């Protein structure tokens, strides 16, 4: 399959825009000057998180919420199926 030059050019431009936005976000000061609340106003907050790290076809799922971990496992299974479909050249029509 031959790539059209315009698609290659657009891909490169999008990568440069992404790098520029990340760099700009790190350089510009944040809108919050004081990151810590005063001692009297500190409250406990429960943040739930979960994530997936793919090392090749092997997923590593982490998190602190059982519900989000199950969702992450399901997403990891879908990602593995997606990778195998592309690796073996199976086309969905």
From Swiss-Prot:
CC terms in the record's Gene Ontology section: plasma membrane
Q: What topology does it adopt in the membrane?
A: Multi-pass membrane protein
Location in the cell reads: Cell membrane
Keyword Cell cycle, does the record have it?
no
Q: Which domain of life is it from?
A: Archaea
**Could you tell me the keywords of this UniProt record?**
Cell membrane, Membrane, Transmembrane, Transmembrane helix
**UniProt keyword Transferase, yes or no:** no
- State where it is primarily located: membrane
| Entries under InterPro entries matching the protein | DUF131
* Transmembrane regions: 7-27, 70-90
Recorded protein name is Uncharacterized protein MJ1617
Q: Give the species this sequence originates from.
A: Methanocaldococcus jannaschii (strain ATCC 43067 / DSM 2661 / JAL-1 / JCM 10045 / NBRC 100440)
């Amino acid at each position: 399959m031959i790539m059209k030059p315009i698609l290659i050019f657009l891909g490169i431009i999008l990568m440069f825009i992404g790098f520029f936005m990340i760099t700009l976000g790190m350089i510009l000061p944040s809108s919050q000057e004081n990151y810590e609340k005063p001692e009297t106003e500190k409250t406990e907050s429960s943040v739930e998180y979960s994530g997936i790290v793919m090392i090749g076809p092997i997923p590593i799922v982490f998190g602190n919420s059982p519900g989000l971990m199950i969702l992450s496992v399901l997403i990891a299974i879908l990602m593995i199926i997606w990778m195998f479909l592309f690796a073996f050249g199976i086309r969905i029509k």
